[in-house]
Amino acid sequence: MKKIESINIMKKFSLFNEEWTPKILGELNGQYVKVCKLKDDFVWHSHENEDELFMVFKGTLLIDFRDKKTVKVKEGEILIIPKGVEHRPRTNGEVVFNLLFEPKTTLHTGNIESEMTVKDLDWI
Protein backbone atom coordinates (compact mmCIF):
# COMPACT_ATOMS: atom_id res chain seq x y z
CA MET A 1 0.00 0.00 0.00
CA LYS A 2 1.15 3.52 -0.80
CA LYS A 3 2.27 5.65 2.12
CA ILE A 4 -0.48 8.05 3.15
CA GLU A 5 0.77 11.40 4.38
CA SER A 6 -0.11 15.08 4.19
CA ILE A 7 1.65 17.37 1.72
CA ASN A 8 2.69 20.91 2.64
CA ILE A 9 1.98 22.70 -0.63
CA MET A 10 3.77 25.94 0.25
CA LYS A 11 6.88 23.94 1.18
CA LYS A 12 6.74 22.25 -2.24
CA PHE A 13 6.76 25.68 -3.91
CA SER A 14 10.06 26.40 -2.15
CA LEU A 15 11.73 23.42 -3.86
CA PHE A 16 11.89 24.94 -7.35
CA ASN A 17 12.29 28.28 -9.14
CA GLU A 18 11.34 27.50 -12.75
CA GLU A 19 8.32 29.34 -14.10
CA TRP A 20 5.63 27.78 -16.31
CA THR A 21 7.09 24.32 -15.56
CA PRO A 22 4.51 22.23 -13.65
CA LYS A 23 5.72 19.80 -10.97
CA ILE A 24 3.69 16.76 -9.93
CA LEU A 25 2.69 16.37 -6.27
CA GLY A 26 0.52 13.28 -6.62
CA GLU A 27 -2.10 11.46 -8.63
CA LEU A 28 -5.68 10.45 -8.07
CA ASN A 29 -8.31 8.90 -10.31
CA GLY A 30 -6.25 9.31 -13.48
CA GLN A 31 -5.35 12.92 -12.68
CA TYR A 32 -2.20 14.66 -11.55
CA VAL A 33 -2.10 17.26 -8.81
CA LYS A 34 0.48 19.81 -9.99
CA VAL A 35 2.06 23.00 -8.73
CA CYS A 36 3.51 25.67 -10.96
CA LYS A 37 5.06 29.10 -10.55
CA LEU A 38 3.76 31.57 -13.12
CA LYS A 39 5.23 34.91 -14.21
CA ASP A 40 4.53 37.24 -17.14
CA ASP A 41 2.77 35.86 -20.26
CA PHE A 42 2.13 32.24 -21.25
CA VAL A 43 1.07 31.07 -24.72
CA TRP A 44 -2.46 31.23 -26.11
CA HIS A 45 -3.80 27.67 -26.10
CA SER A 46 -6.79 25.44 -25.49
CA HIS A 47 -7.30 21.89 -24.25
CA GLU A 48 -9.48 19.95 -26.67
CA ASN A 49 -10.37 17.10 -24.30
CA GLU A 50 -9.89 18.45 -20.80
CA ASP A 51 -11.28 21.15 -18.56
CA GLU A 52 -8.58 23.05 -16.66
CA LEU A 53 -8.66 24.16 -13.03
CA PHE A 54 -6.43 26.95 -11.69
CA MET A 55 -6.17 27.44 -7.91
CA VAL A 56 -4.08 30.41 -6.80
CA PHE A 57 -2.10 30.02 -3.58
CA LYS A 58 -0.10 33.24 -3.81
CA GLY A 59 -0.47 36.34 -5.99
CA THR A 60 -3.00 37.27 -8.65
CA LEU A 61 -3.38 35.37 -11.92
CA LEU A 62 -4.95 36.94 -15.00
CA ILE A 63 -6.57 34.72 -17.64
CA ASP A 64 -7.23 36.34 -21.02
CA PHE A 65 -9.90 35.01 -23.37
CA ARG A 66 -10.23 35.68 -27.11
CA ASP A 67 -13.45 37.64 -26.59
CA LYS A 68 -11.22 40.30 -24.94
CA LYS A 69 -12.44 39.33 -21.46
CA THR A 70 -9.86 38.95 -18.69
CA VAL A 71 -10.65 37.09 -15.48
CA LYS A 72 -8.67 37.89 -12.33
CA VAL A 73 -8.02 34.94 -9.99
CA LYS A 74 -6.80 35.99 -6.54
CA GLU A 75 -5.25 34.06 -3.65
CA GLY A 76 -7.61 31.37 -2.40
CA GLU A 77 -9.74 31.45 -5.58
CA ILE A 78 -10.19 28.93 -8.37
CA LEU A 79 -11.13 29.23 -12.02
CA ILE A 80 -12.35 26.35 -14.16
CA ILE A 81 -11.91 26.72 -17.91
CA PRO A 82 -14.08 24.39 -20.02
CA LYS A 83 -12.38 22.22 -22.63
CA GLY A 84 -11.95 23.84 -26.02
CA VAL A 85 -11.87 27.44 -24.70
CA GLU A 86 -8.79 29.33 -25.88
CA HIS A 87 -7.05 31.23 -23.10
CA ARG A 88 -3.76 32.77 -22.01
CA PRO A 89 -2.64 32.83 -18.38
CA ARG A 90 -0.43 35.75 -17.35
CA THR A 91 0.68 37.83 -14.41
CA ASN A 92 1.54 41.49 -13.96
CA GLY A 93 5.21 40.72 -13.34
CA GLU A 94 4.77 38.99 -10.00
CA VAL A 95 5.41 35.28 -9.40
CA VAL A 96 2.10 33.50 -8.82
CA PHE A 97 1.87 30.13 -7.04
CA ASN A 98 -0.73 27.95 -8.74
CA LEU A 99 -2.18 24.47 -8.16
CA LEU A 100 -3.67 22.43 -11.01
CA PHE A 101 -5.79 19.27 -11.16
CA GLU A 102 -5.57 17.75 -14.64
CA PRO A 103 -5.86 14.38 -16.37
CA LYS A 104 -2.44 12.72 -16.64
CA THR A 105 -2.51 13.18 -20.42
CA THR A 106 -2.92 16.98 -20.27
CA LEU A 107 -0.09 18.96 -21.85
CA HIS A 108 0.17 22.35 -20.12
CA THR A 109 0.46 24.18 -23.45
CA GLY A 110 -2.63 22.35 -24.72
CA ASN A 111 -2.86 22.27 -28.51
CA ILE A 112 0.29 24.40 -28.98
CA GLU A 113 3.88 23.20 -28.93
CA SER A 114 6.39 25.94 -28.20
CA GLU A 115 9.65 26.54 -26.37
CA MET A 116 7.51 26.66 -23.19
CA THR A 117 6.19 23.11 -23.66
CA VAL A 118 7.37 20.62 -21.04
CA LYS A 119 6.48 17.00 -21.78
CA ASP A 120 8.29 15.11 -19.01
CA LEU A 121 7.21 16.59 -15.70
CA ASP A 122 9.20 16.15 -12.50
CA TRP A 123 7.71 14.79 -9.28
CA ILE A 124 8.48 16.76 -6.12
Roles of regions detected by a PLM:
Residues 29, 57-58, 74-75:
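A cytosolic small-molecule/anion-sensing beta-strand core signal
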Residues 83-112:
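Ligand-binding loop in jelly-roll beta-barrel domains
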Residues 1-34, 115-124:
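A short, N-terminal "cap"/entry segment at the start of jelly-roll beta-barrel domains
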Residues 37-38, 47-66:
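Short, conserved beta-strand element in jelly-roll/cupin
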Residues 18-19, 32-48:
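Conserved short histidine dyad/triad with adjacent acidic residue
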